[in-house]
Structure formats: structure tokens, C-alpha cells
Amino acid sequence: MQQSSSVGLCRSVISVLVATALYSPMISASTVDYGETVDGVVLVNDIQTVYGTTNNTKITATGEQHVKKYGVSNNTEINGGYQYIESEGEVNNSTLNDGYQIVQVEGAANQTTINNGVLQVYGAANEAVIKGGSLIVENGGIAVFAVIEKGGLLEIKDQGYAIAVNQKAGSAIKATTRAAEVEGVNSLGQFSIKDGVANNVLLENGGSLLVEENDFAYDTTVDNGGVLKVMDGGTAIGIDKKVGGVLTISTNVLEVSGKNSKGEFSIKNGESINYELDNGSMLIVQPQTKASYTIVDEYASMQNLGSDTGTTVMKYAVYNLGRADIDGQTQYSYDASSEGMKILGGQVNVWAGTMSNVTVSDAAGVLQIMTPLDNSAAPVLTGTTNVLNRASLYVHESADTINATVNLDYSNLVLFSASQISAYTQFMFSELNMRNSDVIMRDDFFSRTGVASGTEHYINLAVNTLAGSGNFYMRTDMANHQSDQLNVTGQATGDFKIFVTDTGASPAAGDSLTLVTTGGGDAVFTLGNNGGVVDIGTYEYTLLDNGNHSWSLAENRAQVTPSTTAVLNMAAAQPLVFDAELDTVRERLGSIKGINYDTAMWSSAINTRNNVTTDAGAAFEQTLTGLTLGIDSRFSREESSTIRGLFFGYSHSDVGFDRGGKGNIDSYTLGAYAGWEHQNGAYIDGVVKVDRFANTVHGKMSNGATAFGDYDSDGAGAHIEGGFRWGEDQWNIRPYLAFTGFTTDGQDYTLSNGMRADVGNTRILRAEAGTAVSYHMNLQNSIALEPWLKAAVRQEYADSNQVKVNDDGKFDNDVAGTHGVYQAGIRSSFTPTLSGHLSVSYGNGAGVESPWNTQAGVVWTF
């Protein structure tokens, strides 16, 4: 147990040399010679070497003082630098606020006050007062009459001495039973450590005691913040473990006994019986030892390399079977075992060995059967496992559960796959009994290297029998004919729901995929997804009872998925954007019939609502808001006049999908228009315009998840209108015929759920016939009003606006047919050069209802 003084001396010299090398680079140096006295020096970027005497020196963070043989330093203040007291050097009444005071062999520091920093002693420290920071007594060093106040720490290393210590309340002592001698007083009375025996030690506030092999500790008090660790072969008797203290022991101790907040405990002869670990305690059950009826309370931990029976693991406690971390090393035991455990809200991990007949309860309760180490025996779950009251059983790949009967009662079984060899991971249980519980199949979030699997690995769950009620959460890849599977080799009884993850990728047309097979029984399996359907690519799928004790996902072509309708909705909305913007220019052309002016600038704000249903099944509500700005000029001829103008505009559409989700279209438009009007009333107008559409899709799948995508597209169109305007007195009537054409370029894009969309050219090819009637009134102060009405019928001929979804969906997404439009408005001139207009319209037919289309604008002529 003792080390030679020569070894201690070598260690001291080496420590001093290393410290000097690390901390001594300075800019300048000064020396106080023998017989010389220096007072009041402040050391900044300076090394002071003292052979004589210094008084009232201040050492800054960049300063050092070396007190040599026969040198003396009095009343030194250390504020972050270093003071070295070498052999036969002496310092008195130092104040250590920060930094280091290092006393070498045969040096002495007397009456040092430590507020912060470290006093490191290889020689002697006499009457030190430790208010903060620490005093460290190294091998062969000695501290005499040290006073440890609240917040201070006295640490005694192996073969160190601390004599006549005064340990006050809230202070800390850190030591091992290999200290040469420690003795003094604490709040409990006299304490000591000598010859491998510790008596009446008080541990708190960062203090600790390590009881080494073949050593002893008697009547140790482990209070809040204190740590007592008893090594294999050590003995600790009469322990008083308080709340907040930490006790770490193993079943290989010779004997450990005492009391904690839960009562008396004892470990002896390789067996722990009725030990209740309280907050902060740790028990390590060593190989070929045993723990019986242990209670692992909140924030305590237990590691078992041997065997245990009847262990209870409380909430926030942690238990590991077959694995222990001892002195920084991880050890495994494949012979470890646990029988009859109760997990009441705690966490239990089975790394190796066998877990038998366990009960897990409470929402925080988790039993986790881990994946074995490479080429090692699998951890085993056997007997009956009861998982109750929202608790969870986690089983990782390659765990051995073939002889386990699992009873789930309002709880969860989660299976994790991460196979690097096969696309499928096999899980096998003897019996699975469920009551309102869930079985969840998923990829493993955990691996021993800390890296989760990067690809999907599917699970084949095989059980001999299945009974009860509950839910199975499974994954599918219909496009590649892969999925999680449930295989009941024997009888299956009860009522179960299968939940399948939605996806945007499509399988080949007509494909089905078997998810469940049983050997018989009256079990009923239905799809638990919303509405009893799951989105798989373009179409929805249902769970089909094949009639031979198997159930398969099968396509339902009568209903496309919400993601498909999202693609169709966005394609169908673009022509409506073009049309709403075109109406602002058409109204401008209609308002200037028979009016003389030179040049005008105009603006028109629009707000439009469209409720749309297409032949392909798209259904949405579009609300468009926009602004068009234009300029035109009128050129008079002998019997007619012409108009030429330019315009540009912006609009934003919010598109709400009937089956969930939404989209947005931002449109930027630019165009030109021209008109000719004869003095007899005949006229013809033409408009050409181009658009840039920025489209954003936020579709909703049936399970509520979002399918996101965005793409840009371009469009171009033209409109021509011809008619005749008759005027009599203040009345005007204007019948007309019009033709409109529009097309977009085709676009391909992919949604975030994997759905691929190929949107072809979306077109308008429309004829229109209508009549407008207006009445002009001149009021006072040059103000004029002109209310007007308009009615028209439109015939849409474009009937092959194709959209392809994945490889199995081809849709004609058009609104061909007859549509009626009814408008009313008023124009007003406020001054000879300023006028305004306001209009509203309603339209319906061919799958499009427009409850309103409002316009408001102003015109400035000059």
C-alpha cells in the first residue's frame, strides 16, 4: 500500500518541470538577490526569481514568481499567474484569487488564503484557509491545520498527508483509502483515513471517497453532491446515504451495508438482497454474482453482468442487462440473466444475456431488446412479457424472441429493422395477444456505431398465434413489390386494423401486394387509414380479403389520390389566370368605343373567384387578385379610328383543393392590343399576351402528410372580337362575336412524396357571342355616368388537356362545354381627364362557376 519516497520525489520533480515548461514563457525576467528586500512589485509579463525577500508582490495572469532556496515571499497576491515555492523556499500570508501556487518538495506555504485557483502541494502547506478553489496534496505532500470553508475543496492524492483538518459545513474532501494519513474534524466529529481504513468521513458538495480493493470505510456519510465508490474487494460498513449523494458499488465487494432514504441495505458474499437504490446510486452486478429483489429508484442505475431476480425499475431509472461501464471500459456478459423484473416507468436495455418473465407499465416504461454484437450470441427475451398501460417494448433486429409470449394491453410493440444483407428482417414470437395496442414496424434509429440505416429494410413478423384487438403500422413499396408483412402460422382471432404509409410512387397497373396471412381463425383485418384507403401513386388502394386467410392491398381505379388531384388542379387553374387578366384589357377596349382622346394611361385591379370541377376529377376553389397597367393612343382617320396599346400586370392566385391542400400561382403578364372602329359603329379588337407562371403545390395525402412541389411554366394567347355599336340618344347597344386561344408549355415535375407529373399543353379554344348595353348620363360639373350591362355565352372546344401522373394515370383535364357570363358595371368621368370604372360579373357552366369577378380602375387621358 506504501510507495517509496524516491518514486514520490521523481514524480514531484517531473511535475514541476512540466509545469515550468508549459507556463513559463515570459517577455522579461528580474531577480531578487540574497540579502535584498523588494516591496510592492507588480508582475506583468515578468518572471521574478527570489533569493532574498519580497513583500506585497502582486502576480497578474501573465506573471510568475519563483521562490528559490532560502528565499522568502510575504503577503503575495496571486491574480491568475504562478507562484513556485522551490526546495527550502518559504511564502507567508499569500492570497490566491486565481491561478496557481505550487509548493515543491521541502518548500513551504504558510497561512495561504485560497479564494479561487489551485494550491498544489508536494512539500508543506500550513494553516491554509480554503474559501474557494482547491488545495491538492500530492504524493508525499502534507497539509497541516487546513480549514475548508463552504465551497472549498481539499483533495488528498495517494500517499498524501492532511493533518488536523477542519472541514466546515458545505465544504468538500476528496480522497482515496490509499492516502498516507488524513485526520481532522467535521460536523459529525473526528474523521480519519490511515493504513487503508477510513472512519467517519463526510462527503458533500463535490467531495468523494474511493475505497480500494482490500481497504475499508466505516460510518461514511454521503450527503448531497458527495460520491462514495467502493471497488471490487472493498468494504464499506455503516454508510449513511443521503438524498442527492451518489453511491457506486458492485456485487464483487467484500461487504457494503448501511442505510439510505429507502431503509437498510446490505451486499455481501457476492449477493445483494433487498437493496433499494435511491437517487444517484449505482449497482454493478458482477459475473457469477447475484442481486435479489433490488429496487432501482428514480435517477438510480443498475448494470447486470451476473444474475438478478425480482428487480423493480422505477420511473427515470436505468437498467442494463449484459453490459456494464466500469472505469471507462465497457464489458459484456452473455451469461447475464434477469428473472421476474417489473419495469414501472424506467428504461431497461437488454444488450446480452436472457430476460425472462418481465412486466412493463407506465407511459415512460421501456423494455428494449438490442441488436447483438457482431458474431455474438443474441440477447434473449423468453417467457411471458406483459406490456401495460401505454408502456413500450422495443425489439431490434436479430434479437431472440422466438419463445416469448407478448401480451400488449393499451401499449406498444416497436420492431426495428436495419439489415445490411437482406431486404427483409425476420421477427418471431411464440404468441402475440393484444388489447387496444399498436405494433409498429420501422427502420432502426439506433446502431452500435451511432449511425442509422440509410435505406428502407422491411420486416416479416411471424407469430404462432394472434389474438385480441389493435393496430399494425406497416410500410409498403408497391412499385418494387416490397412491404412489411404479418404472418400468423397458426390461429388468428380478433379485430385488427392495418395502417399503411402513403406514397406518391405508383406500381404497375393492377398490382396487388399481400400484407397479412394466417393459418386460420376468424380474425378480421381492415385498412385503418382515413376513409379505409391509402394513397399509392396515382390511385387509392384498399385492403382486400382474398378469402383464403390472406389480405392484400388492391387498387381502386374509381378514385384517384388527393396528390393526383393536386396536380390536376394546378394545371386546370392556369387558363383561368390568363382569362381573368385578359378581361381587364377587354373591358378597357369596350369602354372607349365612340370616345375621342389622344393618349391615356389606365389601371385595373381585379378580384376573381372560380369554383372548378374538371372531367378528370380536379376540384378546387381559386381566388385571384391582380393589377393591370396599360397605355394606349387613339389615331383618327377620315371615316374611322384606330387604337394601339401596351399593358403589363401581375396576379396571385390562392388555389384551395377540395380533397385537402392548396396551391399558389404567381403570374407575370405582358401584352399588346389594337382596335379599329368605323364611324358607322363597326369595330374589331385584338389582344395578344404572354404569361410567366410560378406554381407552388402543397397537396395533402390521405394520411394528412404534405406532398410539396413547385415548377414554372409559360403561356401565350390571343383574343379577337368583332361587332357593331348602335347609338341612339344616350343609349348604346353592342352585339359582338369573339374568339380566344391560349396554350401553356408542357412541364414535368416531381412531388416530395415521389409522384411524377407530366403536364401537357393546357389550352383554351373558345368562341363567344354576347351583347352589351349602356346608358350615358351627363351630370353637373362635367361629371358623367355610364351604367352598363353585358351578357354572353361561351363555348369551350379544347377537350384534350392531358396530364400524366406516374406511369399509370393519363387524364383529359379540361372544362369543355357551354358557359354563361353576366356582367354589370358603371363608368364615371370625374374631370375632363380623369375617369374611373367599376364592374362585377357572374359566370357558370362547363365545370366552372365564377361567383364574382370584380374590377375597379382609373383612366387618365392627356
Model-predicted segments: where are they?
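Gram-negative bacterial Sec-dependent N-terminal signal peptides
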Residues: 1-28
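N-terminal segments that cap or nucleate solenoid repeat domains
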Residues: 22-72, 180-210, 254-280, 284, ...
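Extracellular beta-solenoid/beta-roll
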Residues: 42, 74, 92-93, 181-186, ...
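Feature marks extracellular polysaccharide-active and adherence modules
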Residues: 51, 60, 68, 74, ...
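Short secondary-structure subsegments characteristic of cysteine-rich extracellular domains
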Residues: 506-523, 617-635, 757-762
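Outer membrane beta-barrel translocator domains of Type V secretion systems
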Residues: 557-733, 840-841, 846-853, 859
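Solvent-exposed, glycine/polar-rich loop segments of beta-barrel outer-membrane systems
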Residues: 568-570, 615-623, 658-666, 694-712, ...
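Outer membrane beta-barrel transmembrane domains
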Residues: 743, 756-862
